[in-house]
Structure formats: C-alpha cells, structure tokens
C-alpha cells in the first residue's frame, strides 16, 4: 500500500490516501512509483508515492461513518487484483491524516473532496459504502463518473431517514457521554444487526466493552464526525426527480441482512432512474465491504468491467427474460 496526500480545491486542506496498484513490470524504471506524495495537480510533495506514474484509470473507494479507510484496505486490495487497476481509499475529513471537518461542513464538502481525489489519482470509477454511497450519488449529479457502485447508500428520499435521527445523540456527544451517544446511534440507524434492537442500557454496556478494542475506541472518537455527517444527509434530503437526469451507469447493492430501508431506497431509485440498477446481495450484513471474503469484490469488479449484464454502457437497463 502507498500512503500519500491530496490537496483539496476549496481551502488547501489535505486528505490522506492509500493506494493499491497492480504489480508493475520489473526492469522498467520509468514505470515504478516515484518517491514523494502528490497534491491534486500531480506534483510531488512529502510522503511515499506519486500517482502520476500510473496510466490506467483508477477506482476510488469512499468509506462510511464511524470508521476510517483502514477497514476497507483488504477490500481495495482484492478489487485492485481483480481489476488489474489502481484502487484508492482515502480518509474523509475528521480522520487521522486528513483535515478536520470545517464549520460549514456539508455534502458539498465531501463532493469537492471526492473530485479532488479522483483528479489526483486519475480515477473514473467509484465504489462507496453507506454514507460514502450518499456522497457518491450526490457527486454523480455534478461530476463525471464512468461507473458507480454503492452498497447500502444512506440517501434520504422524501424524508424517509428523518425519523432515524435521534436528537439525544447530538446532545450526548456535546455532553461527552459517548456510550450513551453510541447507543442512540445504533438504535436509530439499526446497522448493527440484531444488536440494534437491544435496550439502551444494554447498548451502553456494549459500548463500554467495545471501547477496549481498537475499532471500538476509534468509533467512539469519531462520534462527533457522525453527528455532522448525519446532519448532512438530512439537509440534502431529495426527491426521486432530483436523480432522474443521472447518466452514470450505477449499481446499487444492499445486503440481504442489512436494514430494509437501504433496499427500499435502492429499489425506488432504480425504478425511477434508467441509469440505476439495484440488487440484494444474499447473506451480507451492512458491513459487507469490510468483512472477509472476495464474493462482494467479485460482484463489484464484474460491474465495473461491464461484464455482469446489468446496465449497458449507455446507461439503459437491458431487458431480462
């Protein structure tokens, strides 16, 4: 994995990027990544890799809420091997190695950051999970993407996610009651499987226990970013008509064991937008992209390569027998 930074176009903030590339032929010095990192103009700066040496179009992976890109690196590595193309993860704002969320943070902050990463990496395709799927679908309305895959995209349509917002979550974060905040978030979003339906007291105890693990402690630290991200989703509440002009061939996936509202959103968008197709991935939880195994990566790679038979290059769905 190569670690480097991208400079954003708005305020010169930096985003930490981790890149996986297909093996380069040996003996060709000009094809080896150069030392140094790169800003969004491709100029070398100060880390470990220069993306300008790679000519194949890349894929950008956008992570979800309460996590960093570290959990997605095995998935990104598998996808790079399957596609024989570079795949790039980046830490969104508020994570170590990247700039903090600004005071005026919104979905446009995230869309601008994605555009900067795509420009710097020479990427054309996007794979996005949960909140990342929300960002990617908003971006596809404004910036050119070749192909897009989302998994459990957290898009608010006609206010369908507003009842999942818990004001107690924001208040608990403000008061520093992180175990209480985590419990409200899990109950509200229902993304933790059967655990989501436990009483608040039991969820608080689970939060205390999970804080002893690296991932659990990291999730607690990221709770303030989750508040701003959930606000951004609700503030960008949309209608189906807002997406009808989307032309990027898009595959929206949802896990068979994910909360049902993700699939409901995918089905609604696929029924209204010719460029969007939807499918359920049996046996997968909401955390599908960060769980072990290659099955999901294979499904996504086939779509990105245009070999799965779902959508034609013109973005129109094929008739199925």
Placement of each model-derived feature along the sequence:
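Conserved HGGG/HGGXW glycine-rich cap/lid loop of the alpha/beta-hydrolase fold
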Residues: 9, 13-25, 53-99
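Active-site loop/oxyanion-hole signature of alpha/beta-hydrolase fold enzymes
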Residues: 88-127, 298
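Gly/Ala-rich beta-loop-alpha elbow adjacent to hydrolase catalytic centers
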Residues: 128, 132, 136
